[in-house]
Amino acid sequence: MPSTRQTYPVEFKGGLVTNMSPLQQGINAPGSARVLKNFEPSIEGGYRRIQGYTKYNSSIIPPYGNPVINGASQSGGTLNIANIRTTPVVGDTFKLTHATAQVNNTATAVVNGTVSSSTNVAVDGNVGSIVVGMTVTGTGVDAGVTVTTVTDQNNIVVSSAQSIADDVTLTFNAPDSDNTTHIVDTVVGTIKAGMDVSGTGIPTGVTVSSISGSTVTLSTGLDLAEDLELTFSDIYTISSGGVSYNASERTAALTFTPTIHADNSPSNGDAVEFTSTASNYLMLGCGVFLDRVIVAKNDDLFKVSSSDITQINVPSYGTVLVNGASQTGSSLVVDGLTSAPQQHDIFKIAGVDKIYRVTADASVISGGATLAISPALDSSPADDAAITFLSTSRESAGKTRFARYNYTGTEKIAIVDGTNVPALYDNTTFTALNDVPTDVNGASFVVNFKNQLFFGKSNLLTFTAPYTDNDFTAAAGSGTISLGATITGLIIFRQQLIIFTETSILQLVGNTIADFNLQPITLDIGCVDTDTIQEVGGDVMFLGPDGLRLLSGTDRIGDFGLGNVSKTIQKEVTSFISTNTSFASVVIRNKSQYRILGYNTNITQENAQGILGTQFAGQGGEGMAWAETRGIRAYVADSRFYQNIETIVFGNDDGYLYQMEDGNNFDGANIQTTFATPFMPINDPRVRKTFYKAFLYTDPQGSVSFDMSLKLDFDQKDSIQPTQINFANSTGQVAFYGTAEYGSSAVFSTKLLTLFETQLIGSGFTGSIQFESDSTDPPFSLDAITIEFGINTRR
């Protein structure tokens, strides 16, 4: 018989550990984990289920840039487009805007002359537009009266005879109290049933159910603001064999369904917005900049917010105008240039049909140039006709990286992609550095160090003159350093520029070219993957050939016996490195956490792997606690703390930019978690224990549900195990300060259950507690557990 009951408390800490034998781990680290997926070691204690992610913007990042209509008067089932640098494919869908309008749900006017049993009403003092279908209210007006005819804004006809005094104020409203029917005015184009509707605050998927005169009925009830701009579009799908792409001209001819009605023939230069793609395209880079994110996709760059996406690789050459009338052929004389247009720039000309491409770099003299163009001019432009540049080439870009800086009081971001010239962007103007030296053209890395931009290309490190971002003259303080090995990463650390190669780590100290000094940190350890380098908690984490390492450790102990900080999960790291073909990393600063995320085109989103580490000690690897992630599929990622808000974003090949640490699910999908303690011998592995009860201490952020299982004797094959136990922590509705409204149905006296007590059934020599959840519940922490047991006979 078992003896008197005893208790065994376990504090959950230490993270994932897999480099110990099961019994060693159970004896020496009972609070650690043998499995820890989608839980994070928390700086507040315990293991916390990770937060989810959501779409940063509900639309896909445009895969083909900002293509436009190439030639007016097109209709039917074919369409020529231009300013497209990647070929569309069969099955892609795109949207054409065919009409715009403003919401005009409310208007007022004053009766101008007594109305006596008449349907004719004269008004003045109008505010807003009166349109047919509006309901009319005011003193003396019967219920249900509507406007049937608008002769003009001062003379209307209503649906029944009325007697209204002079100077009575009348109010005109859209007739639908459910807000599916709205009145619109200032209509441009033709609105038709079935069209897609977009505008500020309108969710995706809203369409036109019907239209009668100025009254538009929508598929979804919406409360639309007065004067809101509405856009009405049709969605088209590219048919089989429906793409003819001209790579040299950056144009395409599309065949699609349904057809474009002649009434909705688009104008030259109108936008063609692709809404979905049949093929996947990798996001090549994402960099948080101010309150937006700069995203590289295929051959273009975009500025993305939660509500809009704007192409930024649009050159700014000044106010460019046609210089002289009667020009024809394949050249165009222009003036007003502040810099030289480049080959493959794309532009349109006011008053001239078609879209045009610059076929050779221009030479500018006194602001003027003769542009070589294709195709030949469709017609002769007028003198001083405006030239509008649509995009400049960023073709064949590789992984795109960014550096933020501010030398003049204006925030800027530098952009490199390993192929094209570097570019600068200040949230308004995009500048390609077309005149950089060969050693900078095609740079793969860029950082801001000592108020100079440093560019890494192959084995060369080139820097601008101090406080400049485009001066590469030696006399001004620019220079180039040869490293003798290919650069794999750059980072600023402790007022030094740290330079990584595959086999060494170097540091550049000093302030200017006059005292810059390159010194080795180590010559036999390097970084094998560029995008794993991050500063976290006063150290620099990076992926070495045998695992994750900390630069501070290297700096302190030189070249001898450098151990990696991920040795406690060496098996998982080795598998992670071998399974994935590319890596991205981010730092979550308020958690002192580093995340490295793997990418492989053959691994689905739900199986995408990652490793996270939380740093508990001030510096060094001794305080790192690890866990694994599943379901965060990232090819590129970035994080930044700006104006007290930390933004963490990532992207892959599904078209969307995602925001990490946002929400309770993975973009609508459940978060699946597992945490299993070691197999604990509880004092003596040779003595059988009978398990009676468990007390689980948690810290939830809302109503949650999860399962707990007791696994006995190393869960050996064919062994009988106790059934799992389900925990749910809410006995009623729950409200949190700041999120619930007074007067709602929330019960403020209801508290979340944080201590769970449950009976245990089973006996064995060792025991492990396993927790699992598969839900969209809010995050929760598992802090500690106390197990009641009795001792039986010795084995």
PLM region spans:
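Surface-exposed extracellular loop regions of Gram-negative outer-membrane beta-barrel proteins
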Residues: 497-522
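Hydrophobic or amphipathic alpha-helical targeting/insertion segments
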Residues: 403-433
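A short beta-strand motif characteristic of beta-propeller blades
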Residues: 276, 313, 390-393, 431-436, ...
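Asp-box/WD-like beta-propeller blade repeats and closely related beta-sheet repeat scaffolds
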Residues: 426-447
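Blade/loop signatures of beta-propeller domains
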Residues: 33-48, 457-472, 510
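Small/polar beta-strand repeat architecture
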Residues: 67-279, 312-327, 335-340, 346-401, ...
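Beta-sheet repeat architectures centered on beta-propellers
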Residues: 2-68, 78, 276-312, 393-408, ...
